[in-house]
């Protein structure tokens, strides 16, 4: 049990190019934690966390261009990656084998996100549509139309009720998944929304933008609860802690920041990366944070619980 924030491990030269996306998974055989990284070197790598360090478990080859987004299914056994080659690939985390490839259409897959029941996979598109694919079939089942600009970021609410999308013009849309209806349009940012994340209780939506601000919205009434500043440049990623109390952000200012949700304050700043930090994620129990950056490194941090 840790009482303070500290860096546990640095994996240098983790990839041959910038690392833009990261996730946590689990090995169902021995219960060990896995870190999944996606890079502009076209590769997805699966790392095993053991003895306070990362060990490369498998390298997943198949994408023809850089990997821009990875997500692990809530069920924990499947991983999805999307690439600049306009393909989404589904992988078996255990074996490292590709389950299927989905052609998302010309330049049409950016970020990918699994639904809470692991049955669907959502991806944003250039024409302002969120496309929903069946995980079992690999077929497009339906689309949610924002009638807006290129969608950079998407997130499901953990209760399965909502899907939020963030566009390149700073507009955020929240859809009701059951009806497919657009519920709310939020115009709090004037620049691209790089990332958004719902709180585990699905009550709050946190958004990250190139305008340097993080905003917290109360989902039900679509009201702005807070605007947080602290990063010196684009905010590239945000992720919630599993216990609802904190979230983490990363930025092109090379920092990773941990925020207290109720106090609306930054409680710790990590300055260990040498370049812009594209991805951050809490592990399942909130004891660790992983970050990835343009410096080709993966960092794992210890969090007080």
UniProtKB/Swiss-Prot annotation:
Cystine bridges: none
| Cellular compartment(s) | Nucleus; Cytoplasm
Where does it sit, as one GO cellular component term?
A: Ski complex
Q: Which InterPro entries match?
A: Beta-prop_EML-like_2nd, G-protein_beta_WD-40_rep, SKI8, WD40/YVTN_repeat-like_dom_sf, WD40_repeat_CS, WD40_repeat_dom_sf, WD40_rpt
Q: Keywords for this entry?
A: Cytoplasm, Nucleus, Repeat, WD repeat
Q: Which Gene3D superfamilies match?
A: YVTN repeat-like/Quinoprotein amine dehydrogenase
- PROSITE patterns assigned: WD_REPEATS_1 (PS00678), WD_REPEATS_2 (PS50082), WD_REPEATS_REGION (PS50294)
* SMART domains per UniProt: WD40 (SM00320)
Q: Does the keyword Metal-binding apply?
A: no
Superkingdom in the source lineage: Eukaryota
Keyword Repeat belongs to the record: yes
Q: What's a GO biological-process term for it?
A: nuclear-transcribed mRNA catabolic process, 3'-5' exonucleolytic nonsense-mediated decay
**Could you tell me which residues the WD repeats occupy?**
14-57, 62-101, 104-143, 146-187, 188-227, 230-269, 272-305
The residue ranges crossing the membrane are none
Subunit field text: Component of the PAF1 complex. Component of the SKI complex.
Query: PANTHER family, per this entry?
Result: SUPERKILLER COMPLEX PROTEIN 8 (PTHR44090:SF1), WD REPEAT-CONTAINING PROTEIN 61 (PTHR44090)
Role summary? Component of the PAF1 complex (PAF1C) which has multiple functions during transcription by RNA polymerase II and is implicated in regulation of development and maintenance of embryonic stem cell pluripotency. PAF1C associates with RNA polymerase II through interaction with POLR2A CTD non-phosphorylated and 'Ser-2'- and 'Ser-5'-phosphorylated forms and is involved in transcriptional elongation, acting both independently and synergistically with TCEA1 and in cooperation with the DSIF complex and HTATSF1.
- Please give the family membership noted in the entry: Belongs to the SKI8 family.
Which protein is depicted?
Superkiller complex protein 8
Which source organism does the UniProt entry give?
Answer: Xenopus tropicalis
Gene field = skic8
